[in-house]
A protein has these predicted regions:
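Catalytic nucleophile loop
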Residues: 120-123, 142-166
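Glycine/threonine-rich flexible loop motifs
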Residues: 126-136
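N-terminal secretory signal peptides that target proteins for export/translocation
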Residues: 1-6
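C-terminal and late-domain segments of enzyme folds
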Residues: 27-59, 70, 74-79, 84-92, ...
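Portal/gating segments that form or line small-molecule/metal binding sites
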Residues: 72-115, 128
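Bacterial N-terminal signal peptides
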Residues: 9-21
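Catalytic-core regions built around general acid/base machinery
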Residues: 112-115, 135-149
Length: 294
């Protein structure tokens, strides 16, 4: 463990000295302040919840849970989505839920966000989150939470909503990648996020999105796995893999995505991946070359 921490300190020292700063002046993709925890669904790894609570300020920090992606009309303090947080020791949990945009635009409804240090989006269908909260006072409150250094996390649909482009946002089925809802909350700009990546054999699905919108960065997160975003850098934690879909880069001849493992880092601004070793050289097989036409 000591060797790992020493290597981690070395990694960040070299990375920051090379100009990959985490400060707001360098931001183009990630949040200028605060953190994001983006989980690919099937959350069982205690480390992920613990990291979220740590970034919020500890188990006594006020946390708002938003279960609106789910299919139920009503949620309360006994909602199943709170169980993992209670088991992790969280003591101040508030449920925030509505399907009424007028209510989402009311000061009374938004009030819990003003005191929160963390917000968590549960799973379900991401278009429900967009319908209720996109471009409302709730959306403004979420941005304000990040600006004061808070953390926003989410799993499954709660992961996808954090990107600027909303994949699987069709109200008819979640198999349509570019549907009738295409705008997310944009905590990550110019990014499309997919989830349940390998568990549901979705590893090829983001290709059509990035081919249609070649400036977008596609990020696919498998179950029980997360990316933790600070500024324009993220780290992979959990038990499986994260896939990167970057139209300007390919893996070997024609490969349209590549995988990051737990412990790997990624610079969202430069679109370079790093493995925690005694250097910060990008992955050797990834070539800066546009995808071939099909």
């Amino acid at each position: 463990m000591r060797g790992y921490r020493t290597g981690l300190r070395f990694f960040w020292t070299v990375l920051l000295s090379a100009g990959f700063t985490v400060g707001a002046h360098a931001q183009e993709v990630g949040p200028a302040s605060g953190s994001l925890v983006i989980v690919g669904g099937g959350l069982r790894d205690e480390e992920i919840i613990e990291r979220f609570l740590q970034l919020a300020g500890g188990p006594d920090a006020p946390i708002v849970v938003i279960p609106t992606a789910g299919s139920s009309e009503r949620y309360d303090q006994y909602s199943p989505g709170l169980r993992q947080f209670r088991e992790a020791g969280a003591t101040q949990l508030t449920v925030l839920h509505t399907r009424d945009r007028d209510e989402a635009n009311s000061d009374a409804f938004v009030a819990p966000l003003r005191e929160a240090r963390g917000v968590w989006f549960g799973g379900g269908r991401q278009w429900r989150l967009a319908d209720s909260y996109l471009n409302t006072k709730v959306h403004e409150g979420l941005r304000a939470l990040l600006e004061r250094g808070g953390v926003i996390g989410g799993t499954s649909a709660g992961a996808t909503i954090q990107g600027s482009y909303l994949v699987r946002g069709d109200t008819r089925t979640n198999t349509i990648m570019m549907g009738d809802h295409e705008e997310g909350l944009a905590f990550l700009r110019n990014v499309a996020i997919d989830q349940h990546l390998l568990k549901r054999n979705r590893q090829f699905d983001l290709i059509e999105v990035v081919e249609a919108h070649s400036d977008l960065l596609g990020i696919g997160v498998d179950e029980n796995t997360a990316i933790v975003v600070r500024g324009d850098m993220f780290e992979v934690i959990g038990q499986s893999y994260v896939a990167i879909y970057d139209h300007s880069r390919q893996l070997g001849p024609g490969g349209r995505y590549y995988l990051l493992a737990p412990g790997d880092r990624y610079n969202l601004r430069t679109r370079q991946a790093y493995r925690l070793t005694m250097s910060v050289e990008p992955f050797e097989r990834i070539k800066q070359e546009p995808w071939p036409e099909r």
